[in-house]
Amino acid sequence: MMSDDLTLVREFATRQSEPAFTTLVERHIGLVHSAALRQTGDAHLAEEITQAVFIILARKAATLGPRTILSAWLYRTTRYAAADALRQQRRRAAREQEATCNPL
């Protein structure tokens, strides 16, 4: 019997059920990875974002409400995580550029 997403989230949140979390990851990894890849255009960065999003899910599972649509929550979280990653990448590139232009 396939459980719905929120049942699996509750199972993970209350019992730290690894099988429940694994099922959630298997169901949604394609959505999360493709959204991250579409936003960043970088396969390696998309993999990092995908891992980060599922870590966020693990940490916040207990806070998700009964009306949460998990796929929408994951997509939104992926978009935010990708935007943050791209900002960090731009800041790092700017610092490196500044260090190159202004040697000590």
Q: How would you name each of these model-derived features?
A:
Residues M1-G30, Q97:
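N-terminal module of bacterial RNA polymerase sigma factors
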Residues L8, Q16-L24, L45, I49, ...:
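Conserved acidic
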Residues A13-T14, R38-A43, Q51-I69, Q88-A94:
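Sigma70-family region 2
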Residues E26-I29, Q51-F54, T100:
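Short amphipathic alpha-helical surface patches that mediate protein-protein
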